[in-house]
């Protein structure tokens, strides 16, 4: 293991990552509190409110774990025992897997909601919440099981003289896999990512097509080049499309950086940038949702009127 990893990671990257975590924790907390408050006040929830709130909860826990891991990466001299090392790294990977699966579920669920009655997907509308719940459980188990080798490969680095350890933090590293095992896991990881990202990409393209059709039809009805005022459903669809597009973009960057790490094994900078990219979706996604949520403005106005009156 290269002990100079933290020296090469610039202080700017460290500050950027802690800023990213701080913003992400604050934004996800606000989004989760907003949905909780709307539920307590008795507002009728949208069909996508529960998945979005669930994603916010997953991201909140994931970022808290990431903050604990990053503190050991940048500041600690290494003090985790074997159980802490395996548990923290596995839980962090587990919640990252839940984030991917829940985002995929949200994309598919929104596509089913928006599909016309003539579509084959319309048959899934009535039972979609239950069917998608089973699909989410299956996808999460499948997605997480491919990373289950972490429980064996993750080891504390205190008083260990192994060479060629894969660096994670000052306290924890991965044992190198054999060439056959590495090839097997690489194939499974590639299949997993292609399946999930492909499914998400198809549903995103489908929603974008529906949005364009609806916009064109509205312009024809109004006989004007100016598009009519966006409905709440259209704003929700645009929010989902922005989330999916940003997620696909960050996933592509993450894959590129992961590949570069295999080529530049002695250079820690790709690992530092991968930390930033891997958590950017969890930090930015609640901001995208909050910025397009008109109910927040209405809620603040109603609370202000009650206070004034």
UniProtKB/Swiss-Prot annotation:
Subcellular localization, as worded in the UniProt entry: Cell membrane
Cellular component terms (Gene Ontology): plasma membrane
Residue intervals annotated with topology Cytoplasmic: 41-49, 115-134, 209-238, 290-309
Disruption phenotype: Mice lacking all but one V1ra and V1rb gene (12% of the V1r repertoire) show a lack of chemosensory response to a subset of known pheromonal ligands and changes in maternal aggression as well as male reproductive behavior.
Disulphide-bonded residues: 85-172
Domain of life: Eukaryota
GO MF annotations, alphabetized: pheromone receptor activity
Cell membrane as UniProt keyword: yes
Residues bearing attached sugar chains per UniProt: 159
Keyword annotations from UniProtKB, A to Z: Cell membrane, Disulfide bond, G-protein coupled receptor, Glycoprotein, Membrane, Pheromone response, Receptor, Transducer, Transmembrane, Transmembrane helix
Transmembrane regions: 20-40, 50-70, 94-114, 135-155, 188-208, 239-259, 269-289
Residue ranges annotated as Extracellular topological domain: 1-19, 71-93, 156-187, 260-268
Topology relative to the membrane: Multi-pass membrane protein
Primary site of residence: membrane
Single biological process term from Gene Ontology: sensory perception of chemical stimulus
Pfam families found in the cross-reference section: V1R (PF03402)
Similarity remark: Belongs to the G-protein coupled receptor 1 family.
Protein function: Putative pheromone receptor implicated in the regulation of social and reproductive behavior.
Protein name: Vomeronasal type-1 receptor 52
Gene: Vmn1r52
